[in-house]
Structures are given as structure tokens and as C-alpha cells.
Amino acid sequence: MKKILVTLLFLLFGTVANADCNIKSGSINILANDFPALRTLVETAKECKGSADFKVTHSAEHNKIAVPALTANPSEFSVRVAANSSIVPLMNADLIRPMNDLVKKYGKGIQESQLITIDGKVMAVAFMANTQHLYVRTDVLKENGIAIPKTYEEVVAAAEKIRAAGKMKYPYAAAYKAGWNLAEEFVNMYIGHGGEFFKDGGAQPNINNAKGVATLNMLKKLADLSNPDSLTHDSEAIKVEWESGNVAIMTLWASRSGTLLDDEGDAKITAATKLVAPATVGGGNIPAATLWWDGFTLAKNRSDADAEASFRAMAHAASSKEMVAKAADQAVWLVEGFVPGPKSVGVIEAVKMGAKPYPMLPQMGLMHGALGSEIVEFLQGNESAEQALKDVEAAYITKAKEQGFL
């Protein structure tokens, strides 16, 4: 198995000037998720396009689009903005190219700590860190005599007290949308319980156990305190719930905090919104959360000219001190010159608490996919936790055998 060498550093060492923007040729076509920090990054890259063609697709469906689009020859996109999990299927299918030569030639503004290096090959350049953590309404907690929760058991108790007081019917929210989002909630909670997804460093599944059952039971308790339509709610949907005043405690990505704390919306809710550390669970001492990086990769099935133009534009953005100064509240930037502010607290606390990175294992995408589809019936009350976990392992094993992991 490949050794993954990834470092997320928040006290980053100095480097020299930003990327040169004198691009004369090539085509730049970027696929990225859709949230403010990534739009800022892509707009900064566009400043450097020179004479190159420049297109971008921001989509919440980026994970579904990426592999088919990069499998085409030539690839539909020259750049895929990826993260811990989404880079793995690209590497498994040999769809992205190493960037060592381009880093050496054009990467003077990029810090070594930003380089995602796998078996000596630079496969991505990271520009921001992310995690999911708690958001709380301090006014609602104070009114009900509730301390800021530090564990998910305390989250459940707090939400039950708020509901019992008649303040809110569904006081908790998290991105439980069936599929990728729901699976991510399981991953976080299972890691918080000390779970390991695979046996003995191999690819045999290892979730049908007491920790897996405890994970599902906690997810069910939280789901029962959430909107009845929670299995359709992604990050954007729960932000709407928060801004509508329907929720007092929420688990959400750090990168989504910007629009919750801006000048738009209900001033009372904004003033009472506080970002705090991720919660622990089950008596564990590490967060029930995972650390993530976002970075850019280059498609293999594009010309060298397109790869060079794309790298230079993206390297300009991924090393822009001006960008991180202007957009300091949008992300925890892994770029020289970034000064963490109040909106960075969730990521910084997660690091201090020893949060684990999302598992960058070749077979993890198959496990994630199985979780996203097979635990839904349990949360709907239609089957037991044990049966749901059996279903997950069976679905995973089928896919793992098809792809040669088992």
C-alpha cells in the first residue's frame, strides 16, 4: 500500500515571490466544489490566465462528475480541485499527473508543507484546511442554562432540554443527506469512538462491531432531534435552517462559516452564533471529526501545455498573500501570510485535540459509498443497527472484489 505523506501545518515557514503570470498559451478548465473560498481561489487563478483559455465549473456534484470527466481523452477538465477522499479514486484510476517538474519550475511561491507527496511524487498542492465542528446559539443556550457542549452526549442532552422547553422543535442539525454527506457523519462518529475501518491494515471491512453500533445509535439520537427531512439536507440546507432561527446546535464545515457570520440575515442570530471545537463521543479523547485539506490536481489526459498553464494559474492562487489577506474569514488557508481569525477556531481546535485526517486509503471510497446508501434504513427505523452494518460490509465486499481489493 502506498505511503501517504501529508502534513497540515499552521505555522508555515517563509518562501519567496508569487507565481509568474506570463502565460502565453494553453487551456485551463477547472472542476471544483461550490463554496465561497473555492470561488475566491478560482477567481484569483483567473487573474493569472494570461493568453490561455479559462473555464470553470463549480458544482456540488463534483465528486460524481470528476472520474468520468477525467477518464475522457482528452479530459474535460485540466484541473480537479480535490481533497483527502476525492484524490484517491483519481489516483486509483491513474487520472492525475505528478507535478514535481512544474513545482520546481514554477512553484516558488508554494510552501513545501502544501505539497501532497505520495511515493515521492507531488500529486496535489493544498491551499486550505477544513473540518466539521460545532456551531452554537449562545443566546438559546444561556436562556436554558446550558453550557457549551463538548461531547455528543452533551449535545443530545442540550437539544432535548431545548425541545422540552418548547423553544425549538428540531434544535440540532447536521448534513445527513443520504449518500456522501451521511457517510461522512458516520466516518466522523466512528473515528470518535476509536473505530478502525479495516482489519490489520488490509482491506477486510471492520465496522460490524460494538463501536459501529454505538456510532449508529448516536447518529439516530441526533437525527431524532433534527428536521424530519434531515436525510435530504446537505450543508447548504442546514445553513438555511440555522439562518431561519430553527436550530441551536449544528455540526458544519469550517469553510461554510463565512456566510453565517456576514452582515446579511438576522442580526440577532448572527450575533449569537459562536464557532466552537468539534465534539468528542463515547468517552473518547479525540474529536468525532476528520481533518481535511483541499488542493488542486492536474489531469493526466491533457496536453503538457494545458498542464503548464493550469499549474501556473493555480499556483498563483495557492500562494497569493493578497488573496488570503482579503479572504481570511473564508477558510483556514495553508498559504504564507495567513493570520487565523475567529472563524478558524474549529480547525485549530481540532488540530490541538489530535483530530485524525480522513483516511486516504485506496479502498476507502468504496466503504464511504456503501455507508452512504446502506445506513439509511436504520435511521428511518426500518432495520436494526446490526443489520445495517452487515449490509454495509456486504455492499463494500462486493465492490472491493470487483476492483481487486479483496
Cite the ranges covered by each PLM segment.
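C-terminal lobe and pocket-closing loops
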Residues: 255-270, 281-373, 403-405
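Short, solvent-exposed loop/beta-turn-alpha elements that line the ligand-binding surface or hinge
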Residues: 97-110, 171-177, 193-214, 262-273, ...
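Hinge/lid segment of periplasmic solute-binding proteins
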Residues: 84-131, 147, 156, 185, ...
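Conserved C-terminal helix/tail region of periplasmic/extracytoplasmic solute-binding proteins
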Residues: 22-27, 142, 324, 353-406
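Conserved N-terminal structural module of periplasmic/extracytoplasmic solute-binding proteins
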Residues: 4-9, 19-86, 148, 231, ...
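Extracytoplasmic/periplasmic solute-binding protein
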Residues: 123, 132, 156-204, 247
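A structural signal for short loop-to-beta-strand junctions that line the ligand-binding cleft
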Residues: 67-68, 75-78, 106-141, 170, ...
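Glycine-centered hinge/linker elements that transmit conformational signals in sensory
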Residues: 159, 202-231
